[in-house]
Amino acid sequence: FCTVIILILCIMKSTRCILSIILGLLAGWLPLGAVTVLKNLQVEYQTNPLGIDVSQPRFNWQMESDRYGACGQAYRLWVADSPEQLAAGRYIYDSGKVLSGESVGVVYQGKALQPSTRYYWKVSVWDESGTEITSTEPAWFETGLLGSGWSGARWIGSSETQLSKYRSHYVIDYDVRVAEGNDKAAFVFGARDADNYVSAELDLNGSGDARFILRHTTDGKTTQDASESLASIIPASDKHKAHHIRLKVTTAQYALKYFVDIEIDGKTLVNSSLTPEEKERKSRGDFWGGKEGAFTVYPYPDGELVYHCRLYAIGFLQPKGQTATFSNLCISEDTWNTLLYNPAETYVEKGEGKLNVWYPGENVSAPMLRKAIKIEKPVKSARLYATARGVYEFSVNGQKVGKDYLNPGWTDYRYRIMYNTYDITDLLRPGDNGIGAMLGAGWWSEHSGFLTGWQDQYGTRQSLLGKIVIEYADGTRETIVTNDSWKCYDRGPITFNGLQNGEEYDARKEVNGWDAPGFDDSSWKPATLFAAPPVNVEIQGYVGSPIQNNVTLTAQSMVEPIPGVYVYDMGQNMVGVPRLTFKGKAGQEITIRFGEMNYPETIPTEPVAPYTIAMYKEKKGQVYTDNYRSALSTDRYILRGDAAGETYEPRFTFHGFRYVEIHGLERPLPLEAVKGIVLESIGVRTSGYETSDERVNRLFSNIIWGQRGNFLSVPTDCPQRDERMGWTGDAQVFARTATYNMNVDPFYTRWLYSVRDNQGDDGSYANYIPVVGFPPHGAEDGGGAMGWMEAGVIVPWQMYQQYGDVRILEQHYASMVAYMDYLERRAVRYVQPFGGFGDWLAIEPTNSMLTNTAYSAYDALIMEQVAKRLGKDADQRRFRTFYENVKRSFNDLFVNEEGRTFAPTVESIFGKDSQVGMWPGTAATEAKIVDTQTSYVVPLQFDLFNEKNKPLAIRHLVENIKKHNYTLTTGFIGTPYLNLVLSDNGYDDVAYKLFEQTAYPSWLYPVLQ
């Protein structure tokens, strides 16, 4: 994603100017005749939006003319509460003629808008000749609830919690009694099949001390992990009594290891083999794995890339001739204290030496909720206001409501939940109507981020909040809300769903007509009521671009690498879900896997460990998924056996992929039966780029597809693996390009709410937003990496520059000032501390004190301009002074006499006891020359070199580029500015050579792979 950031659009200054520039260039050959129109009328940067939840919305329009130099000199804006009133001149707001050429962000100044009301508007513009042009296209906006409340609506859901077999943190409790004359009782968890599982065995050991033995079996080979005496817990006289076993299981990063804490009869089992150092480490825990359990089970210690330390199947493995009784079995989680599985059975296991396992909780599916309503009068309009803790999909009379996916999207639900507004007028019918909703895990529960401990980030059980307002033709209104009069069913077809791990769907469990009128729901249970969020959580009208499908791909080719396995190439790396159409027998299971590339047809002769030639031969042509790490990214579908065929499109997940691998078919699907439903949150495309060089065109296409894939509710770093997080560094370096490519003002406005919500008390911004971490509180440290935290300053500034969005500066200003306070407090001699990510993934690492300090200067430059735009004169002077001081210190401390970049020691700036940060590289223990591309590019872009040093820095930069044969050595923060700096300083020729380079590392290198 980040390696394709280029600045080929740098000639553009602002989206407000692009249209007039183009028309000016075309004026020489356009036909004569003054034709000027007003078009693209928008409210809050959206066309005819529903559910606007702001009291003073903003209006935009574009003036289009075939005459050179046409421009607006004045405008007049009218708003009415019906088309008839607008035509008759009876307005609720008339701006009067305003002598201004502004056409972006014009603020409504009329009387208070009413909630749940549609308003119509038009605008007139007077051009430079005084001619009045009035808009003709229909334009309206509709308010949301505007704080009017939810009319008693309650959060509803299921009384049961869906238990995933892919769960990585859980607690297993059970009672066990070994029959007289017997010695052993073995419980099993983590069973993927008969050759892969973990066993926890109580061994009464005849006349000896009872023992507890932990083993794992991998590919049929059994290894003992622990054997501990129970002499202090189970005396000889109690051996054959019932004993309570508790296994608290967690996993290491990427689910590579099981960590197990064991209690027997309420007493903790101590691992006697641990060294003092291991005990200390396990008690302390760390960022990557949290607190390790006392015992470790490592199924693949040789480092094979598998991520299978999960719950999977549970059961028993009784040795031959050994009988034991298991009872009071339950599985829970101890973060939100949720009981996940609690069967009533007592299991008497008579030893046959065979594995007896099952998937716990597989009968609980995604909740389905319904309500029957009756319409007895003609309907004028009907609106649905809805949100969920989780994700949801509404339907009315069997038809899906809206075009969105995975609503309400991702915000930090600890602070903010957004609701959606839908027009359901045309879905209602006279008489009986059926209202339905399904709930999925979404970002609320299941796995988040790149650590398997980051599970159930906000809770374990999903819930729905809804309100339907029906306005009848006679002027009366009826309101229907979610409450315990709704019915719930949790034995439906979606047997599992998670954004990272995929969806599992059993079509045999479909309930025909469940969301239609006349359905008999007498066997359904009343919906369970859930507590409302804490009072600090704001429930806000939806802001931003919803996740939708605007592009659909069809498979381009298919191969069969091994019999019965079919791999389809979509022709383009994409983000979304498949839509597959197939026929088969009832109960036939189809497994769908995804990959961005396949194992090569040509077998490497010297593979890099842990890969082997045998592995490459075995997997030749199949999808490669190791780069997904612990994200299983697998869908499963069980056919219902419909002779007419069945179509499957997952509802509550998404994948990043180019290749679709399908198992379980009797014959391959035709290409037209394999579709790729591209999901994205991007706005309207506002730019294009085409050259005579197909490599460059492909690069630009990659950039657009990269934006499509990573702009999904939040700006992510990657959409395919076990991360998918709103990394702020990725967001800020791409923000300028993103604002050129698409109308992303609503998208970024939405994300900046979370940026502010997650800001630290000290003013720092988080490294990824929404903040995720070990629940219930998320990441404790939040942030601290400069170049990442700068998203809180750079993104709103780019929005203002490209869209004229003053309001985002007003909304975000206090937050930005708090960040500047933070930078000033922690600086010493105007130098920022070493640490953070620095120039992440650079070929040549750059000292992070240098880049951190440079970014603090850039923050001050931006804030000087923001303060000026908002009329805050004292702040403007403050930030200018801060910038000048940083610049002076930078030249004194980071540049030597030859104009080369230089790294002083941390101690020389911060003292002996200073705490240095993390990678890349280490803090300088002795002063040394830096002399990397980034060390010149970043301060040059931020105008930090003084008059003496600037020409020297430019020369050294060019020398470095030539030394590396016109290839990139920059990383995240150096790459975006490199060509700009070269062009701005008279080196277009070097910039072109760098840009046209195809050797590694370069912009065009990945295009040719």
Can you say where each PLM-predicted feature lies in the sequence?
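Short, intrinsically disordered, charge-balanced linker/junction segments flanking boundaries
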Residues: 30, 155, 247, 1006-1009
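Bacterial N-terminal signal peptides
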Residues: 20-29
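Boundary at the C-terminal end of the N-terminal hydrophobic targeting segment
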Residues: 32-34
